[in-house]
Amino acid sequence: MSTIDNLDAHTPMMQQYLKLKAQHPEILLFYRMGDFYELFYDDARRASQLLDISLTKRGASAGEPIPMAGIPHHAVENYLAKLVNQGESVAICEQIGDPATSKGPVERKVVRIVTPGTISDEALLQERQDNLLAAIWQDSKGYGYATLDISSGRFRLSEPVDRETMAAELQRTNPAELLYAEDFAEMALIDGRRGLRRRPLWEFEIDTARQQLNLQFGTRDLIGFGVENAPRGLCAAGCLLQYVKDTQRTSLPHIRSITMERQQDSIIMDAATRRNLEITQNLAGGVDNTLASVLDCTVTPMGSRMLKRWLHMPVRDTKTLIERQQTIGALQDVTSELQPVLRQVGDLERILARLALRTARPRDLARMRHAFQQLPELRAQLETVTSAPVQNLREKMGEFTELRDLLERAIIDAPPVLVRDGGVIAPGYNEELDEWRALADGATDYLDRLEIRERERTGLDTLKVGFNAVHGYYIQISRGQSHLAPINYVRRQTLKNAERYIIPELKEYEDKVLTSKGKALALEKQLYDELFDLLLPHLAELQQSANALAELDVLVNLAERAYTLNYTCPTFSDKPGIRITEGRHPVVEQVLNEPFIANPLNLSPQRRMLIITGPNMGGKSTYMRQTALIALLAYIGSYVPAQSVEIGPIDRIFTRVGAADDLASGRSTFMVEMTETANILHNATENSLVLMDEIGRGTSTYDGLSLAWACAENLANKIKALTLFATHYFELTQLPEKMEGVANVHLDALEHGDTIAFMHSVQDGAASKSYGLAVAALAGVPKEVIKRARQKLRELESLSPNAAATQVDGTQMSLLSVAEETSPAVEALENLDPDSLTPRQALEWIYRLKSLV
């Protein structure tokens, strides 16, 4: 690409372009030329590939053809959406000078920078999903992490203590754009993430960060926000705020505070747990058959986004949870009345962000007005609900009668998309605007009268008066009658079958009308900007109202789900444990064609670990996951799928369920499994809920069994976590005999000949066998293979009764039951030097060893 080194060799326009491009070398520059945004050189080549648009050439500059690509200005949002979805950023350069008065190229400047993490335009955002900008910082003491949702003003920071916690935060927040320092050491942690942006070190300086944040919030210090003693988080937040100011180039009044997210305030879930529980994304990367897909019937986009935040960050404060439960219970009788009204509120949260950024469009203000119009009915319906939390929400919603009246007077019922299209401000709002419009709108009547008058005066029946954008107003006469045109008609344009003329009176009226249209549009833009000035002083109360409406939507939704899906209200206990009566998996029960088999669960200080055995496909994984999901739902304040639930304190949820090769990192299935297991053993506490499924299956039988046994021992004896431990190693069913707090349960099945029926019912005690061959037959494995497998199984059982499936009192004899002491015969052989023996001594040793066996 050409550079600014040889500017003089270029045309004036290209000189202007290259200077602007030099200020934004790493992102695409949309350069406004008339009705198009043009891209040149490397930008044009990239855009043609990313957007599938034509790559052409524009003349020559500096003696070389200029690669060029362009998009129409009226379709720019569609193209921006495509680029943002691919992680690209775009600088928008507009004409700010007047072409009529400019000498040389029209003055242009970059008015905004669109990046994946800072978009607020409705067309570029997914309405039911948060769009976050994030920054990450690392030093010797740990990590700093900050996130900002510019479409709501929600600003958060945290200080993850280790790599695993940081990875979990990245997965939970899933930022659209991630800023990192140029010397960031842990690139493996963020490689492959979308929207990575390398930033200079000075942007992360702590003093600069404090100064930036205090300036934004209008404060002298950050003590009031509770973040003063979070230096690593502040470093990340400072860089993030600097980046937003650089890209938005406007004030950010909706970003009014910053909140510290502390680990002790919420239930911690690592990346593997979030993935395995399929909270908002299934294992295939989609959204079907997830917890959110069942639970999210919210009627506003902002409510949907809040519900997903709750699901990914369950709270541990029981006061908050009980308040939510009480609100859900109080709202159950009015959900059918509230939801249709709430639906009309729309996405007030994001409309307010665009208002703050002064990018709100006429239809945004119309939607805001429509939201205000719903408030009286919502407040009236909630007035009858006798619940303190509900009344608190009702108060926070506010009324905004004056703002509603203002928008009803100012904006027409169905405004156009853009202010520049005109016709946004309602008649009667401004007297001067009405006068200019009357003058412009009166043109049609005047032209009709002029046409009738001139036809009568000239006697020319083909005469008509018209207008086009190029030549303005004209009088048209057919070619056949054009020789009869009066002498005061001045020819303006010749067509194939007609001539067009102008007369002084029409020219004078044209100037007057065009002036009135221009003045009306200019005044309309001014009045529209003044509306922002009238609305923005109320921004804080409006944001509080939007948050209350979103929370109401979530709670009404949870009330409806509880009633529709037959959920019950869980109770919280100070004592450790989980007691569930007839628990169900919230997702599986919705996709099954037959009734779901509900099952109990009892974990307590005296029964902290359940060893779960049973056939493949018997329901072990479903049983384990449903326990975690019931706990998760309880800790967002929701009702749960069970007959009754009592649940004690939980600080973390871990899952070690299933695995696949991590080819990108060069890790095998077994390595992935062991890494996740190590994380659990290092971080679980006695208040953690741990799900362990098939530990050790990725290696040899003896290695796997040894690891599974040791892990179970560690969890039961040392950590004492609440653990569900599913296994096919039946030797582990001996654990309850060897240590306290461990019990056996199994998933039932019935076998008849070559067929098997899964009962999906949890029973006390260990399973008698795993039914592996029956499941293989069910899967369609050829009969001759199944027959051969049965023969081989009988051989193995006869050769190695201790290691095979020999049934002893409902369990199996343990591979680990062999005494650890070495036998005397083995010890004697180890100490024997066969090379030093005579034939007679060797014979004596044979008899001696025989006697030791």
From Swiss-Prot:
<dbReference type="InterPro" id="IPR027417">
    <property type="entry name" value="P-loop_NTPase"/>
</dbReference>
<dbReference type="GO" id="GO:0003684">
    <property type="term" value="F:damaged DNA binding"/>
</dbReference>
<dbReference type="InterPro" id="IPR007860">
    <property type="entry name" value="DNA_mmatch_repair_MutS_con_dom"/>
</dbReference>
<dbReference type="GO" id="GO:0030983">
    <property type="term" value="F:mismatched DNA binding"/>
</dbReference>
<dbReference type="InterPro" id="IPR005748">
    <property type="entry name" value="DNA_mismatch_repair_MutS"/>
</dbReference>
<dbReference type="InterPro" id="IPR036678">
    <property type="entry name" value="MutS_con_dom_sf"/>
</dbReference>
<dbReference type="GO" id="GO:0140664">
    <property type="term" value="F:ATP-dependent DNA damage sensor activity"/>
</dbReference>
<dbReference type="GO" id="GO:0006298">
    <property type="term" value="P:mismatch repair"/>
</dbReference>
<dbReference type="InterPro" id="IPR007861">
    <property type="entry name" value="DNA_mismatch_repair_MutS_clamp"/>
</dbReference>
<keyword id="KW-0234">DNA repair</keyword>
<dbReference type="Pfam" id="PF05190">
    <property type="entry name" value="MutS_IV"/>
</dbReference>
<dbReference type="GO" id="GO:0005524">
    <property type="term" value="F:ATP binding"/>
</dbReference>
<feature type="binding site">
    <location>
        <begin position="614"/>
        <end position="621"/>
    </location>
    <ligand>
        <name>ATP</name>
    </ligand>
</feature>
<keyword id="KW-0067">ATP-binding</keyword>
<keyword id="KW-0547">Nucleotide-binding</keyword>
<dbReference type="InterPro" id="IPR036187">
    <property type="entry name" value="DNA_mismatch_repair_MutS_sf"/>
</dbReference>
<dbReference type="InterPro" id="IPR000432">
    <property type="entry name" value="DNA_mismatch_repair_MutS_C"/>
</dbReference>
<dbReference type="InterPro" id="IPR007695">
    <property type="entry name" value="DNA_mismatch_repair_MutS-lik_N"/>
</dbReference>
<comment type="function">
    <text>This protein is involved in the repair of mismatches in DNA. It is possible that it carries out the mismatch recognition step. This protein has a weak ATPase activity.</text>
</comment>
<dbReference type="Pfam" id="PF00488">
    <property type="entry name" value="MutS_V"/>
</dbReference>
<dbReference type="InterPro" id="IPR016151">
    <property type="entry name" value="DNA_mismatch_repair_MutS_N"/>
</dbReference>
<dbReference type="InterPro" id="IPR007696">
    <property type="entry name" value="DNA_mismatch_repair_MutS_core"/>
</dbReference>
<dbReference type="Pfam" id="PF05192">
    <property type="entry name" value="MutS_III"/>
</dbReference>
<dbReference type="Pfam" id="PF05188">
    <property type="entry name" value="MutS_II"/>
</dbReference>
<protein>
    <recommendedName>
        <fullName>DNA mismatch repair protein MutS</fullName>
    </recommendedName>
</protein>
<dbReference type="GO" id="GO:0005829">
    <property type="term" value="C:cytosol"/>
</dbReference>
<dbReference type="InterPro" id="IPR045076">
    <property type="entry name" value="MutS"/>
</dbReference>
<keyword id="KW-0227">DNA damage</keyword>
<keyword id="KW-0238">DNA-binding</keyword>
<dbReference type="InterPro" id="IPR017261">
    <property type="entry name" value="DNA_mismatch_repair_MutS/MSH"/>
</dbReference>
<dbReference type="Pfam" id="PF01624">
    <property type="entry name" value="MutS_I"/>
</dbReference>
<comment type="similarity">
    <text>Belongs to the DNA mismatch repair MutS family.</text>
</comment>
